[in-house]
């Protein structure tokens, strides 16, 4: 007889089930039948243990605890209707996870069958299993292995997920940080690369053994995460020192500018030569223009000796030379 059975025999718990095999099963959320224990194919002890494991593992979560944990995760305001829906789904997942713990139940049944006494060992009763659903690790010192160990020890809805066949499977993956990077190739095409931190091949094989969990994170890249190669940051084609030298090299920059200027001057000189040769060809091909001849016009200039007072002035001059006194009038 084990030490647990002795303690239970000496100090029976208030939650211990009656040992009468003809009693009826209590009405629970998962079992609504009222058949005697004798009608089942198994023995009474195993039925008592399985009944105790299924009936008392029904967990509930209060709204205060749910709001407190959501506030720790960053969701400060959640509507009451959405909170009630989330609470209902959470309790359903917790109860399903508790019912899926079949190895522990089978071990307890084997121990009860091997013992000579009919007293089943007491099982711990949890009124609330919300404390088992901890938030994501907030410290950077926590490694992925510690997170995996912590997830192994936990027995809550965070440890289970729904597979393709509807079975409940345990996952031990730590949260991944996915970063999409848009890179441009030399030919002008763009390529989206995934630089998330992926698991190693051994860890992926251990986690995916016996499970068919659907991974929706690789739908954007068109291939599953198992076939996705490890991403890497492409090294630069030249170092930063070469970039600095290329920027601050005055001689190289002068040579580059000189080559560009010479190429530009050659193009301009070629254009000017073509223009000059075109003008010269036009001048050589055109006939000579005749010289313009001036038109002779009659001279309309009047000589001063032909004026009207010329005769009068000449008479006065003649009289003055000869000493003749002028007369009153010259007619």
UniProtKB/Swiss-Prot annotation:
Pfam families the record matches: HYLS1_C
UniProt GO cellular component terms: centriole; ciliary basal body; cilium; cytoplasm; non-motile cilium
Residue stretches of biased makeup (Basic and acidic residues): 1-12, 184-194
InterPro entries (alphabetical): Centriolar_ciliogenesis_assoc, HYLS1, HYLS1_C_dom
Subcellular location(s) of the protein: Cell projection, Cilium; Cytoplasm, Cytoskeleton, Microtubule organizing center, Centrosome, Centriole
Residues covered by region (Disordered): 1-48, 96-157, 183-227
Null allele phenotype: Morpholino knockdown results in a specific loss of cilia, with no effect on the number of cells with multiple basal bodies or the number of basal bodies per cell.
BP GO terms, sorted: cilium assembly
UniProtKB keywords: Cell projection, Cilium biogenesis/degradation, Cytoplasm, Cytoskeleton, Phosphoprotein
Stated role: Plays an important role in ciliogenesis. Required for apical targeting/anchoring of centrioles at the plasma membrane.
Family designation: Belongs to the HYLS1 family.
Protein name: Centriolar and ciliogenesis-associated protein HYLS1
């Amino acid at each position: 007889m084990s030490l647990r059975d002795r303690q239970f025999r000496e100090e029976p718990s208030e939650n211990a089930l009656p040992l009468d095999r003809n009693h009826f099963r209590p009405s629970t959320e998962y079992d609504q039948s009222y058949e005697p224990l004798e009608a089942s194919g198994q023995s009474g002890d195993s039925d008592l243990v399985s009944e105790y494991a299924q009936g008392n593992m029904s967990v509930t979560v209060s709204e205060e605890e749910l709001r407190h944990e959501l506030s720790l995760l960053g969701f400060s305001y959640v509507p009451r209707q959405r909170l009630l829906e989330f609470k209902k789904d959470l309790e359903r997942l917790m109860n399903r996870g508790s019912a899926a713990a079949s190895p522990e139940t089978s071990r307890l049944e084997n121990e009860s069958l091997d013992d000579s006494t009919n007293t089943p060992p007491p099982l711990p009763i949890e009124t609330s299993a919300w404390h088992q659903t901890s938030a994501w690790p907030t410290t950077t010192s926590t490694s992925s292995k510690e997170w995996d160990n912590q997830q192994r020890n936990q027995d809550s809805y965070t440890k289970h997920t729904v597979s393709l066949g509807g079975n409940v499977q345990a996952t031990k993956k730590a949260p991944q940080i996915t970063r999409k990077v848009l890179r441009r190739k030399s030919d002008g095409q763009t390529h989206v690369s995934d630089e998330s931190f992926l698991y190693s091949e051994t860890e992926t094989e251990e986690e995916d053994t016996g499970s068919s969990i659907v991974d929706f994170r690789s739908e954007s890249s068109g291939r599953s995460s198992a076939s996705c190669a490890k991403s890497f940051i492409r090294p630069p084609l030249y170092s930063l020192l070469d970039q600095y030298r290329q920027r601050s090299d005055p001689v190289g920059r002068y040579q580059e500018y000189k080559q560009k200027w010479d190429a530009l001057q050659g193009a301009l000189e070629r254009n000017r030569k073509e223009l000059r040769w075109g003008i010269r060809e036009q001048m050589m091909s055109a006939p000579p223009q005749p010289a313009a001849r001036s038109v002779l016009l009659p001279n309309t200039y009047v000589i001063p000796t032909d004026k009207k007072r010329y005769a009068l002035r000449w008479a006065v001059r003649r009289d003055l030379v000869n000493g003749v006194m002028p007369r009153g009038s010259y007619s």
